[in-house]
Amino acid sequence: MEWKIDKDCVDYQMSLMFMQERVKQVINGSGDELVWMLQYEALYTGGTSADPQDLLNSDLFPVFNVGRGGKYTYHGPGQRVIYPILNLRSRNICDLHKYIYLLEEVVIVTLDNFGINGCRKEGHIGVWVGTGCQPPKKIAAIGVRVSKWVSYHGIAVNLYPDLSHYDAIIPCGIKNFGVTSAKEMGIEIRSFNAFDRYFKKSFVKIFGE
């Protein structure tokens, strides 16, 4: 498995083409599985179930309609995006619910290293924080797609993005719960390096090499 880490913001259209090409390579056996860690300039993406009414302001940043699962979400600086391109068949994970559960687990284990108690919320994909009397907020979104059981797209974890940029959408189509970040929780993760190190360790522990 190859790990690719980009320090600078990546062009979104280029990233789609890169993922699609790597998926083809994994399917035909000419390329290795890949976990790609990156970030984008500010933009919005809409998944296959996105409702146009959830896009409240289409003029603020570029909007891309893509083939991943899910609705509208935001990407931008301070958010770590992770795209695992895995052969799920060879890993005996031919079950999207199981795959998403495992991705959530990787994020939960990673965030625990920073003192963030992430959890799942029944009926909603992603990783959430806040329990008891506190309304839960999403700290990590997940939207995936598979082609011949090779996965792509993936995870977006909010470390220190500008959360006001979410105001132009209804994130993931959920009106009753908000979004948060490590920074909003009072936890400074100013360098992606530490997050990446813990994420890789957690990912390998759960998915293997």
Swiss-Prot record:
Q: What is its main location?
A: cytoplasm
Q: What is this protein called?
A: Octanoyltransferase
Where in or outside the cell? Cytoplasm
Active site residues according to the UniProt entry: C172 (acyl-thioester intermediate)
Enzyme class, top EC level, equals: transferase
The family classification in the record reads: Belongs to the LipB family.
Query: Residue ranges of the BPL/LPL catalytic domain?
Result: 29-209
Task: Name its pathway.
Answer: Protein modification; protein lipoylation via endogenous pathway; protein N(6)-(lipoyl)lysine from octanoyl-[acyl-carrier-protein]: step 1/2
Q: Which domain of life is it from?
A: Bacteria
Q: Organism source for this protein? A: Neorickettsia sennetsu (strain ATCC VR-367 / Miyayama)
